[in-house]
């Protein structure tokens, strides 16, 4: 009985401590966050009003129009 109670307690704590994951954006290359890390840049905004943080290598390159 004590083992069952201990197991349930541990499972409850683990479910509360582990994050459910962050929402993905920009073709699954970015993550919706309140703040971006130093190696990431904001390119668009997510549906939940958070910033879509994307590493620069996954952002599209700007092309100049040719006339």
Swiss-Prot record:
Keywords linked to the UniProt accession: Antibiotic, Antimicrobial, Defensin, Disulfide bond, Secreted, Signal
Alphabetical list of Gene3D superfamilies matching this protein: Antimicrobial Peptide, Beta-defensin 2, Chain A
Presence of the UniProt keyword DNA-binding in the record: no
Cellular component annotations (GO), alphabetically ordered: extracellular region
Intracellular or extracellular location(s): Secreted
Coiled coil: none
Entries under Pfam families matching the protein: Defensin_beta_2
Keyword Disulfide bond: yes
Database matches in InterPro entries: Beta-defensin, Beta_defensin_dom
A biological process term (GO) from this entry: defense response to Gram-negative bacterium
Family: Belongs to the beta-defensin family.
Function: Has antibacterial activity.
Protein name: Beta-defensin 123
Organism of origin: Pongo pygmaeus
High-level lineage: Eukaryota, Metazoa, Chordata, Craniata, Vertebrata
């Amino acid at each position: 009985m004590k083992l069952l109670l201990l197991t349930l307690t541990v499972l409850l704590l683990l479910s509360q401590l582990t994050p459910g994951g962050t929402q993905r954006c920009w073709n699954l290359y970015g993550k919706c966050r309140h703040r971006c890390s130093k190696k990431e840049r904001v390119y668009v905004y997510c549906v939940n009003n958070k910033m879509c943080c994307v590493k620069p290598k996954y952002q599209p390159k700007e092309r100049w129009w040719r006339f």
